[in-house]
Amino acid sequence: MNPYIHNQIKPEFNILYTLRKKNPLVICITNDVVRTFSANGLLAIGASPIMSECSEDLKDLIVYASALLINIGTLTPEKVGYYKEAIKLAKEYDVPIILDPVGCHAGAYRLSVVLDLIKTGSISLLRGNQSEVKAVYDALSSDNKDENSPLGKGVDGAQVADSAIIAYRLARLINCPVVATGEEDYVSDGTRVFAVPHGHSIMTAVTGTGCLLGAVLAAFFGIYDSFKDSLSTGEFLAYALAYYGLAGESAVKVSGIKPGSFSVAFIDALYTLDDEVLVSENRVQSVVVPDQLQVYFVCGTQDTELNKKRLLEIVEDACRGGITCFQFREKGDGTLEGQQKLELAQQLQHICAKYHVLYIINDDVELAVAVNADGVHVGQDDMCLEDVRNIVGHKVVGISIHSIEELHKTDVLYADCVGVGPMYTTSSKPDAQEPCGPERIAELQAQGLNLLCVGIGGITIDNAMAVLRAGACGVAVISAIAHAEKPYEAVRQFKELASSL
């Protein structure tokens, strides 16, 4: 029984059932080549497709729409004007806009059109193959100047290294979720990152499977409001990708590896798959990228003289300053418990969500579930990692490791990241162990630790670089931010330091 939740009935997992019941209307401004395939695919999943090619028509339709898909596959200057008019109309009626930047990595004109559409600030979801997503990120990012990075291959693109990181960074840059498809699909909402197997390789040999995915994601996005209290946008879209990939694999079992037969079998599979299969296959995997842990702030009321208001102010300042992760650690004499702790955790969750900051709960697994935090961090003496994973599902799971001995007895298979420390002498934790120094990170990695690490304990702006150079992807800080005269400025210093590597 979760003491923070009054209604103990577990919500039913019914994404596909809900989609078919709601029958969302998806307006498709799409590639001439794939209209029929896209329409049939949307009908198969339980959505209602309608194709639109002029503003006069769209004005009548948009009031009924659950989502708008803009696919630039067959591009003309006249269509660009229509895309922009469609975006204005959709924004007026609060209809989510899904943009498929087909082939934008293959030509300057296509890329310029995509960038103009993104710069309207109205796109709700960007879905492209990994080469397309990388092209958009490279064009928008002032930090990515690597001219030797792998380019896409033709219009269909190729597998791109570091696609999880690119999806995360681009989602934060354009303030909307990004789906990057390849041999492994990645989705990020700017806070979380998820990986999903793409399906069968034959899907890339059938014209329209990528374009149909954009339409399917539009339909899913159109019903997200029904699930926003239980699933992050990223995790919800990851389930849509899992469904699509499962349909591809199921179709191959029926059709064999034959592109012509596959198309029919694929539409059938989209129609027949249900929520039970989607859950049982467990294809969604949480991914943690180094950027998420770069500046990791840990705090609770014990660090603010038991002043809740001050804690909330500091956390908001820290989020504005650029922390990438916040851990709510409420421990010690006089700290909050029960309903008061729950209410504060919810307030902190809202702040972190506002700034797309990863929100972690320290030790309290039940609280993490109750407030739908992004993750939980546990110590060596807390609940075993397998039990934690079984309870929190796809949430981020962090574990503290202080020594090589602890590493060898910890089942890191169930964790996503590790906190190593204390790096230096610390006054923030009265029960802290003896300092192990930054070299402990390298020692643990030499012994086989391959999870992302953050150093914690006594870290200041003066000694943080040594921790990062030792192999940590980030620094976890308490006092240097919580007790700073200007927390915002303190965070900026840590951010600049970490970014300089």
Could you say what each language-model-derived stretch is?
Residues 200-217, 233-234, 259, 456-457:
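Short glycine/threonine-rich catalytic loop with a Thr-x-Gly-x-Asp
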Residues 216-268, 470, 479:
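Conserved post-catalytic alpha-helical subdomain immediately downstream of the catalytic base
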Residues 108-193, 340-415:
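Conserved phosphate/ATP/ADP-binding segment of small-molecule kinases
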Residues 20-38, 43-49, 56, 289-375, ...:
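Conserved N-terminal beta1-alpha1 strand-loop-helix module at the mouth
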Residues 20-25, 190-203:
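Glycine/charged-rich beta-loop-alpha catalytic/anionic-binding loops adjacent to active sites
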